């Protein structure tokens, strides 16, 4: 029944019958006049009915809407154009636009059925997307084609004039510019690029006017106020323009207007004057003007290639200022390793503070600081270390190196050994200073030299039992591991401590075994150290010395005891590394002397004849020491710096041990005593070992040469390692990778790299590519 009634009334559902009822509601909506709820619902149902029952109803509605919308817009245009003043025109346009744009969201809603019938879109239960509405598109396109296209240039120019006035300090209603921007942004109905109209017009005009403004203002300000004031001006204007851009330009995610504007401002304010600004950098760094440098940094960081010249200036300053300070203090630091390290740390802290305050610890500037500081640390201008290299009996000299690693090792020794310095410091202070050394060590190129000296000092401390703090000693080994020192080196240091601990247990067992035996020397007075040759790396050179009978008789007892517990192992006695305490008695008093085995052997020559004079020649026969070692040992007993009365006297007087002759006579000083505060002490103890090396001259030469030989082997190993992996590689790439592998030990010199490549080619480990002599190929 309902269906037949609907068919019966179909004639009343045509467009012509319904539009007269629909049109007044449409006009009310366009004019933002109120409509009743019933009128609103009727509009929905009438549109639906016409689209459903009138075959051409949808097209007719669309056309009628277009005519009414156009008429409404013409009226709005007339109201806008009635204003001749630019500001008044802007205000009028924005009022009309905002009213119209509000209706762009409301009017399309009742006409959703047009989407289905005209565009074939399927209806959805979801909320319709009004931005894609056919009626909304009609409204925006009509506004664009009529009013906007006619006055957009005036609108745009007026808005830009207001922005220009604001830049000059004049006040105005910012909503006028914002309103124009909103109009540009929302007018485009192109679904592919909804910001096209805005970008092609408003954004372009805004950027162009900004650039014109600063192309005029900036040069004038720079000329009148100078570079340093100009930097403040440029920085202030960039911040000001960014705030303005966030207010006047579109900021939605898919739009990059603000970024484009800032790039434009940077070009006009900074890039154009890049060279002029950068010319001030070097002077600012020298004067430590951190605030001004920070300002320059913030400006140049926005410019392509702006930072690199600043990095170069910083590097040059650190190197020149650092070396100048080192040269100025050369007289002190070359003789005092503590002062040397303090000087290096002072420089590091000074340059680090500059980088922090001026450049906010930017990684690029930290890298520049590190590179330049490394050059200072490794410079060989003030003092240098020359490592000799003997090949086929010919002594050669390698390129001089910085003595820094040796001095760092000496300073570590001062902190770790019982010295006046270590005694006045707490454990925490010693640890802090050692970590400062490790900080400097990070910049040392030839760490293998540090390793050699540090190990030599450690050997001496462990053998003589003169470590200030055994816990810190062992911590130092782990700290060296943490800073990237080679594992094989650190492991050997750890093994040295292990040997000392094992020796303590062995001594205890030896004393227990012989506590009731009568030895030439009581077991309690003997301290044996069994050291692993691989860890301690002692020279194969043995220095023979004729030992006192008491020691000679003890040696077989120790060997027999050791073999019972460790069969198959062989002991090699290193008298050079041994030491002991002897008692000196005379009419003045009784004194304990800490001496080396060589000093002991020399002094025991007088045991049976204390008042006789013995010639150099006879002492050589009695001790069987090599000439050089005997001279060195005698000099330590006749010219010990800390003694006012020496242990031995000699005649005739000479200036150095080299001047002793076969006939030089030596005798025990019967008036020997220890003097303290100008008073003779009847009892006391003195260490005569002093800084005597526990090595021979020849062994030190071997160690120096060993450093170079080890570098050669390490270089060859690294080249083979790279070639095995790469199979084929260019010379430049090979050198780069080689430095990377060896950097924790030493920096290989180009000459050495070239020589080892040639050696490997000669021995057929690698060959040159026939097509390119600078390319190498691995030969399995």
UniProtKB/Swiss-Prot annotation:
Q: Which residues carry this modification: Phosphothreonine?
A: 210
Which SUPFAM superfamilies does the protein's record reference?
Cullin homology domain (SSF75632), Cullin repeat-like (SSF74788), Winged helix' DNA-binding domain (SSF46785)
Tell me the Gene Ontology biological-process terms attached to this UniProt entry: cerebral cortex radially oriented cell migration; proteasome-mediated ubiquitin-dependent protein catabolic process; protein K11-linked ubiquitination; protein polyubiquitination; protein ubiquitination; radial glia guided migration of Purkinje cell; reelin-mediated signaling pathway; regulation of cytosolic calcium ion concentration
One Pfam family of this chain: Cullin_Nedd8
GO CC annotation: what is one? Cul5-RING ubiquitin ligase complex
Highest taxon of the lineage: Eukaryota
Record PTM text: Neddylated; which enhances the ubiquitination activity of ECS complexes and prevents binding of the inhibitor CAND1. Deneddylated via its interaction with the COP9 signalosome (CSN).
What residues bear Phosphoserine in this entry?
Answer: 34
- Keyword terms: Isopeptide bond, Nucleus, Phosphoprotein, Receptor, Ubl conjugation, Ubl conjugation pathway
Q: Where is this cross-link: Glycyl lysine isopeptide (Lys-Gly) (interchain with G-Cter in NEDD8)?
A: 724
Domain Cullin neddylation as annotated: residue spans = 711-772
How would you summarize the oligomeric state and partners of this protein?
Answer: Component of multiple cullin-5-RING E3 ubiquitin-protein ligase complexes (ECS complexes, also named CRL5 complexes) formed of CUL5, Elongin BC (ELOB and ELOC), RNF7/RBX2 and a variable SOCS box domain-containing protein as substrate-specific recognition component. CUL5-containing ECS complexes specifically contain RNF7/RBX2, and not RBX1, as catalytic subunit. Component of the ECS(ASB2) complex with the substrate recognition component ASB2. Component of the ECS(ASB6) complex with the substrate recognition component ASB6.
Q: Which PANTHER family match?
A: CULLIN
Describe its function.
Answer: Core component of multiple cullin-5-RING E3 ubiquitin-protein ligase complexes (ECS complexes, also named CRL5 complexes), which mediate the ubiquitination and subsequent proteasomal degradation of target proteins. Acts a scaffold protein that contributes to catalysis through positioning of the substrate and the ubiquitin-conjugating enzyme. The functional specificity of the E3 ubiquitin-protein ligase complex depends on the variable SOCS box-containing substrate recognition component.
Q: Which family does it belong to?
A: Belongs to the cullin family.
Name of the protein this chain belongs to: Cullin-5
Say which species the protein is native to.
Answer: Rattus norvegicus
């Amino acid at each position: 029944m309902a269906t037949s009634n609907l068919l019966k009334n179909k004639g009343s559902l045509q467009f012509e019958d319904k539009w007269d009822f629909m049109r007044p509601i449409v006009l009310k909506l366009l004019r933002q006049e109120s409509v009743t709820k019933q009128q609103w619902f009727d509009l929905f149902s009438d549109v639906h009915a016409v689209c459903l029952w009138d075959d051409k109803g949808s097209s007719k509605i669309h056309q009628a809407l277009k005519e009414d919308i156009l008429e409404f817009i013409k009226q709005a245009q007339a109201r806008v154009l009635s204003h001749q003043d630019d500001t008044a025109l802007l205000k009028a346009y924005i009022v009309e636009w905002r009213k119209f744009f509000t209706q762009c969201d409301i009017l399309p809603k009742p006409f959703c059925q047009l989407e289905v019938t005209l565009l074939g879109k399927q209806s959805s239960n979801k909320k319709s997307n009004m931005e894609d509405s056919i009626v909304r598109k009609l409204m925006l396109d009509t506004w664009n084609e009529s009013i906007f296209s006619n006055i957009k240039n005036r609108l745009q120019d007026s808005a830009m004039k207001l922005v220009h006035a604001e830049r000059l300090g004049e006040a105005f209603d910012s909503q006028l510019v914002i309103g124009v921007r909103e109009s540009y942004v929302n007018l485009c109905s192109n679904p592919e690029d909804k910001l096209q109209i805005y970008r092609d017009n408003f954004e372009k005009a805004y950027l162009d006017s900004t650039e014109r403004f600063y192309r005029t203002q900036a040069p004038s300000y720079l000329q009148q106020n100078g570079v340093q004031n100009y930097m403040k001006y440029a920085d202030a204007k960039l911040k000001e323009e960014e705030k303005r851009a966030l207010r006047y330009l579109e900021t939605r995610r898919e739009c990059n207007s603000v970024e484009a504007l800032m790039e434009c401002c940077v070009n006009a304010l900074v890039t154009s004057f890049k060279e002029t600004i950068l010319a001030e950098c070097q002077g600012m760094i020298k004067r430590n003007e951190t605030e001004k440098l920070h300002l320059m940094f913030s400006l140049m960081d926005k410019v392509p290639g702006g930072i690199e010249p600043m990095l170069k200036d910083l590097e040059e300053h650190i190197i020149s200022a650092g070396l100048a300070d080192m040269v100025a203090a050369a007289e002190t630091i070359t003789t005092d390793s503590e002062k040397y390290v303090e000087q290096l740390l002072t420089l590091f802290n000074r340059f680090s503070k500059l980088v922090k305050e001026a450049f906010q610890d930017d990684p690029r500037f930290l890298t520049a600081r590190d590179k330049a500081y490394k050059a200072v640390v490794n410079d060989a201008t003030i003092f240098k270390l020359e490592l000799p290299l003997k090949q086929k009996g010919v002594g050669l000299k390698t390129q001089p190196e910085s003595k820094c690693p040796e001095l760092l090792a000496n300073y570590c020794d001062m902190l770790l050994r019982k010295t006046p310095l270590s005694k006045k410091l707490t454990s925490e202070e010693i640890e802090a200073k050692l970590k400062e050394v490790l900080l400097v060590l990070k910049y040392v190129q030839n760490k293998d030299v540090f390793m050699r000296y540090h190990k030599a000092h450690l050997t001496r401390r462990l053998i003589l039992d003169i470590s200030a703090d055994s816990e810190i000693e062992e911590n130092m080994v782990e700290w060296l591991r943490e800073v990237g020192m080679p594992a094989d080196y650190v492991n050997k240091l750890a093994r040295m401590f292990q040997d000392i601990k094992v020796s303590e247990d062995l001594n205890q067992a030896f004393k227990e075994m012989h506590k009731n035996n009568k030895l030439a020397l009581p077991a309690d007075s003997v301290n044996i150290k069994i050291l692993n040759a691989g860890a301690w790396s002692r020279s194969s050179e043995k220095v023979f010395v004729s030992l006192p009978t008491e020691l000679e008789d003890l040696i077989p007892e120790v060997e027999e005891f050791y073999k019972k517990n460790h069969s198959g192992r062989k002991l090699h006695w290193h008298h050079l590394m041994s030491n002991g305490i002897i008692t000196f008695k005379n009419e003045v008093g009784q004194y304990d002397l800490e001496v080396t085995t060589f000093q002991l052997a020399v002094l025991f020559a007088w045991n049976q004849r204390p008042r006789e004079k013995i010639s150099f020649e006879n002492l050589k026969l009695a001790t069987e020491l090599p000439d050089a070692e005997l001279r060195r040992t005698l000099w330590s007993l006749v010219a010990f710096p800390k003694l006012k009365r020496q242990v031995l006297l000699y005649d005739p007087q000479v200036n150095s041990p080299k001047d002793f002759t076969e006939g030089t006579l030596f005798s025990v000083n019967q008036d020997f005593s220890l003097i303290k505060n100008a008073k003779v002490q009847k009892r006391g103890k003195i260490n005569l070992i002093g800084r005597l090396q526990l090595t021979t001259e020849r062994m030190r030469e071997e160690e120096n040469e060993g450093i170079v030989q080890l570098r050669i082997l390490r270089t060859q190993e690294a080249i083979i390692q790279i070639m095995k992996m790469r199979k084929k590689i260019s010379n430049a790439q090979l050198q780069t990778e080689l430095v990377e592998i060896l950097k924790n030990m030493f920096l290989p010199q180009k000459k050495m790299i070239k020589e080892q490549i040639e050696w490997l080619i000669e021995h057929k480990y690698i060959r040159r590519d026939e097509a390119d002599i600078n390319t190498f190929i691995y030969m399995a």
